Each structure stands twice: as C-alpha cells, then as structure tokens.
Amino acid sequence: MKDVAQSLFVGAMTARRTVALVTVAFALSVGQGFWAQGPLTLEAIALADSGNLSEAETVLNEALSGPESADAMTWYVHAYVLKERFVEEGNQPTSPQRNKALESLRECIRKDPQDRLEDWWRPLLLFLGESLLLDVQVEIRNIAPGQPVVAEQYFMQYAEIQRDLDPEVDTAAEWVLMQQQLGETAMTEAQALEKAGAGPWFELGTHHYTLAAEKNQDQYRSLFNLAVHTYNQGVREFKTAEDDLDAIDAALENASRHWLRASEFLESAITKDDTQAEGFEALAIVSTALLNQDRIEWCKAHIQELEGH
C-alpha cells in the first residue's frame, strides 16, 4: 500500500514539470577559459575533474574569500563541488553539503542577472530539487504520531527550489498530494492495528487529510478518503466493546459520532463533485449505520414495552 502511494506521489510530482531532470554529468572544464578567469577557480576545477573534491572545496573557500567571489562561475563551481560531495557521501538527507550547495548556487544566480550561466546552474538546481523530493517520499513512509513531520520540511525546501526555477510556479497541488499520502499512510497503520492502538494513527491521518481538504485542489478525494477512514474508525471503536456489554453503550455512542462526521465529510465531498457514484454509495452505507444506531437506541428506550411489561 505504501509503495503504491509513493509511486503515485512521484508520478504526479514529475508529470507537472515540462523540464525533465537533467543529471549534472558534464565536465567542469567545459568553457572554463571564457567564464572562470580566477586562478584559484581554475585550480579547483582541475582538482574536481581529477576527483579531488575535498581539495577543490578548500581551494574554492579561499577563492570565495577574495576577489574571485565576484565571479558567478566561482560560486557555480563551488555549488557543483558540494553537490558532488553530497552524492559521494550517499545522498544523505542530513548532509550539510546539499544546503551549502544550494546557498552557493543561489549566489551564483544572483551574480548572473543576464542568465549567461543558466544552462549550467538550472540542471544542478533541478538535481537538488529532485533529491529533496526523494527524501519527501522516504519521510512519508516514516511518519509517526507525536513526531515532527519531516516530509513537510523537505517539501518546503523543494518548493523554494521550484520558485527559484520559475517564480510563477504553484506547488499547491503537490503539497495537497503529499498531505493525502501522509494521511493515507497513517490511516493504513490504523487499519492494520485494528482494535489495539489505532487511535493515535487515526488522529494523525485525520490531521493530514484535513490539511489537504482545506486547499482548493482535489478536495473531493481528500474529503471522500477522510470520510471512509472516519467511518472505519467508528467500526473499530464499536468492535472494541463486542465482548464487553458494560462498555457497549459508550462504544456505540463514540462510533455514532464518527459515523456522523463521516456523513458530513461525504456530503461536503459530493458538493465538490457530484459525478462520483462512490460518494453517494458511501453516504448510503454511513446513513444505514446511523439509522441502525437510532433503532438500537429506540429499542433500548422501549425494552420493557417490547418484552410485554
């Protein structure tokens, strides 16, 4: 279930972009005679091309503390070397090299107002953005009650990069999809736990589906899924009292509250898209559960009368 969810997430994220990910695989020495005039930058390029990344970074740090810091190419080379170190270290999400590479790349862009280096910095920026997107996918699977939602942190960095690439870009639909997948991951855990410990996972899933439903993208799906999981939580809570007659009244009351909320979510979903038959079918099921609960309450209130007393 989780792997399928992540595949959908990746597909939706990459389908939006018209520019495909271009791996930065070209040699730094290309065009160096025209762009990189500084001797330290040239030395760093030679070191990087020979695989001596740490030495190249040391030389670049010296270059950036002097006159060569005014050269956009020097900042680009610095970003490239840091990116290579990030890859060399295994693309670790917590690696400081990625953030440092982003800082240098943004400085390169600021010093290149005519975008003469765009064909160089854009692929590198795309690569760094995609690396963050991969971390979002991993952290969706790692979500847990009471823990920071790291996926959101990585997504915010990813969204900033998309704005670097295109100031007019809107990542709201991608953000909604991430919230849906966070919600679905939590709800799947709640379902797997059944009677024992489902509550915290259900609350976490509700939180993320609610965040998704608040945005004006794919609201029907967010509300419908939230309704289905809310109904199922009511069923789970009712089942906890199956073998405990003393607790069944409270369990039924709790379940009915979930079913009522589920019906409200479904009604809202249908107002967003009344062409989906599943919405009406689910509402019929929830309404039947509420009706049966009302019948039980009526029977309890008239039990003596029904027994002929």
Briefly describe each language-model feature range:
Residues 72, 176, 183, 220-221, ...:
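Helix-start (N-cap) detector for alpha-helical repeat units in TPR-like alpha-solenoids
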Residues 82-127, 131-149, 187-207, 231-264:
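Short coil/linker segments at helix-helix boundaries
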Residues 74, 118, 168-171, 222, ...:
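TPR alpha-solenoid repeat register
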Residues 34-119:
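N-terminal leader/linker segments that initiate helical-solenoid repeat arrays
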Residues 20-31:
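Bacterial N-terminal signal peptides
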Residues 63, 108, 158, 212, ...:
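Canonical positions in the second alpha-helix
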Residues 68-69, 113, 163, 217, ...:
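Short coil turns that delineate tetratricopeptide repeat
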